[in-house]
Amino acid sequence: DAQESRGLGDVYKRQARLLLLLMNEMRASGRRRIVFLCIGTDRSTGDSLGPLIGSKLAAEVTGDVTVIGTLEHPVHAVNLDRTIEEMEEHYPDAIIVAVDAAVGRWDHVGLVTLEKGPLRPGLGVRKELTAVGDISITGIVGGAESGDPLFLQSIRLSQVMRLADCISRSICLG
């Protein structure tokens, strides 16, 4: 157990360093505020990763950091476009870090991706939603080739919680 915990600590630190590098690169252009846009819904276990992370971050972050998308106020397919418009109005020069659950290959379940560039929410369930973000973070919650949205309801909560803890701890370390 201690060895596994030590390994996770290294993962958190590595992810935190990568995120910090990306944000510092963008801050060099004069952008100071950071907005974490955590996408998903509390009505589907597999799609709850974003709001879980948002709730964890909202309790921890301060200063020039804003969190949008929590369990209490989720950002999902229905309100995503309106939320993006509001972000552009209130935080026009912010660095947007978009966070969402993803589905992928079964052997990738539990992995986290961190990329420079926008997130394309809904791809795993064949929805065409607006791409958003300067940096994207996804946690692969399940493996699915079918694109069946009902699949997300059968994903184990423990898997989603582990990813939420990993991602939120990494962000808080950064």
Role assignments for model-derived ranges:
Residues C38, V97-A102, S136-I140:
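Short beta-strand segments
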Residues G122-G174:
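C-terminal folded domains that constitute the principal catalytic or ligand-binding module
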Residues D1-L8, Y12:
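Single conserved hydrophobic/aromatic residue that forms the stacking wall/gate
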Residues I68-D93:
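Catalytic-core regions of hydrolytic enzymes
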